[in-house]
Amino acid sequence: MKPQLVNLLLLCCCCLGRHGVAGTWSWSHQREAAALRESLHRHRYLNSFPHENSTAFYGVNQFSYLFPEEFKALYLGSKYAWAPRYPAEGQRPIPNVSLPLRFDWRDKHVVNPVRNQEMCGGCWAFSVVSAIESARAIQGKSLDYLSVQQVIDCSFNNSGCLGGSPLCALRWLNETQLKLVADSQYPFKAVNGQCRHFPQSQAGVSVKDFSAYNFRGQEDEMARALLSFGPLVVIVDAMSWQDYLGGIIQHHCSSGEANHAVLITGFDRTGNTPYWMVRNSWGSSWGVEGYAHVKMGGNVCGIADSVAAVFV
């Protein structure tokens, strides 16, 4: 069967699956069909690279009904945050530990299941709060969901669901010593709200310190930071992640277009292509059960440019 016919059948099936067979298509349905058609063309290009070394593969997912500019506006809400090259004055030194072939903080039961930021550009808040949750659990305390909405509503110099900087959020949390409350007390709404204040006596988790690093060309040191300090907040270029289904991301992203904040929980160097295990905030149905695998070395997607470790 010709590829054009396959794409047409897929287009029809997907759209019928979303909108049913009754009635006529509205303008919004036609727009979604046009976006899906553009996605199919884009997938052909993204998958045109040789499929070797477990390279990533791309296809139809929950974002295929969005044009790239819509996807970027809705889901890529992180601002670039400059970090000094390691080592630099003021940075916490990294112990010179031996690197295992594979390590994942999930195996230590200190990483919560993947969350979903929905149509809120609050990735910067999700990554920071997830790092704090894990840092607390690494100390032997319970692994709880903390309030992302509290950071979205209250963080100074950030814009909530319209975007923000994870380093700016960490600096604000550290300087104010604000206590993050449980998600159940201040649940996620996926929209900006008015900041709710809690008494200082309120139980919660505060950020004692954080360190920001630029590990470009030093990803072994970055792996040591992960081992020594816990999951790391990073900012990446995730435009091509709109179409990601699995495999190891090695191409199709830039080290100069940071737009999305995520959390690195581990790495795997057992195969031909070593990779970072990257926890996203687009739900567990995206990627590899909510994770992306990004090649270690070469600063793929700018993953080593702005890296933060959190201490609670």
Swiss-Prot record:
GO terms for cellular component: lysosome. It is an enzyme of class 3 (hydrolase). It catalyses: The recombinant human enzyme hydrolyzes synthetic endopeptidase substrates including Z-Phe-Arg-NHMec and Z-Arg-Arg-NHMec. Its EC number is 3.4.22.42. Residues 1-23 form the signal peptide. One of its GO terms (molecular function) is cysteine-type peptidase activity. The active site is at C123, H260, N280. PROSITE patterns: THIOL_PROTEASE_CYS, THIOL_PROTEASE_HIS. It is found in: Lysosome. One of its GO terms (biological process) is proteolysis. Residues 24-98 form a propeptide. The keyword Metal-binding does not apply. Its main location: other. Keywords: Disulfide bond, Glycoprotein, Hydrolase, Lysosome, Protease, Signal, Thiol protease, Zymogen. Proteolytic enzyme possibly involved in normal cellular protein degradation and turnover. Belongs to the peptidase C1 family. This is Cathepsin O. It comes from Mus musculus (Mouse). The lineage of its organism: Eukaryota, Metazoa, Chordata, Craniata, Vertebrata. The gene is Ctso.
